[in-house]
């Protein structure tokens, strides 16, 4: 009998010391766990290094990356009355308006002002706990002056100078994310050049990762979970690259869960995608029928997170449990600054359930 999925199905114990609080000296120094799933109960695991990733690629393959750029979204200021305030930008709406989370001892009132640096910003609206905030000075300029890199809360430290470079992919272009597409952090220019020299193609989507990626799932029954929305753009160039990959019997390989989410959200059938620009709230859990993505390169994700549910949909709940247990035993480094895993193919949807 099919098991109704619960949040607790995705819990695992992680020793505290395996959380990578800082990046390694070089991006491509990471270890790489390669997990070839054969059935719902069988997975072949091998321990490799990031530089070995190229050996698992064929010239016909297509890597799809996310070229979003993380903005320094965390800012500190004070109310006109003097109370301290933390502003965490969730989304840029325009040059002068943002959606933001605001932490203060007392919630700011609509119409009130906050001082960030020398700039006054105005609270215009509040919906579902998120504020719309207006600034005369363009927010990108204000963030450049006052913002700090929005590193994940589980790093349990303040952002440092190194995070400005290392919590950003080398191919980051389009500003708008408030969290990094962390699978991409493992790639340096040299590795990308070696992959290209093998004939492997590359295409870029843009998905602005939101603060929702850090929000815990608050319900036990996953059918009741409301997935956060993220804006993405998928161009004709990507549409053509996916079609060309299909014509050559190559694999569409998502570099990260954000690239996967964009590709699957833009699926139009027959393994193809269409041009898209807008929001997605796609929530991928075991039993999901993948339309586009054939292989997934990703990091190790938090217990009970929507990202762990996504990789379980790709490789199977039981297989992911085995893979993660192996990673813990072998002392892999976890989360954003941690090591990587590669799933060279996926399971049929029905086999991914418990």
From Swiss-Prot:
It is found in: Cytoplasm. Transmembrane segments: none annotated. Pfam families: Queuosine_synth. Keywords: Cytoplasm, Queuosine biosynthesis, S-adenosyl-L-methionine, Transferase. Pathway: tRNA modification; tRNA-queuosine biosynthesis. It comes from the Bacteria. The keyword Cytoplasm applies. It catalyses: 7-aminomethyl-7-carbaguanosine(34) in tRNA + S-adenosyl-L-methionine = epoxyqueuosine(34) in tRNA + adenine + L-methionine + 2 H(+). One of its GO terms (molecular function) is S-adenosylmethionine:tRNA ribosyltransferase-isomerase activity. GO terms for biological process: queuosine biosynthetic process; tRNA wobble guanine modification. Its EC number is 2.4.99.17. One of its GO terms (cellular component) is cytoplasm. NCBIfam families: PRK00147.1, queA. Transfers and isomerizes the ribose moiety from AdoMet to the 7-aminomethyl group of 7-deazaguanine (preQ1-tRNA) to give epoxyqueuosine (oQ-tRNA). Belongs to the QueA family. Monomer. This is S-adenosylmethionine:tRNA ribosyltransferase-isomerase. It comes from Dichelobacter nodosus (strain VCS1703A).
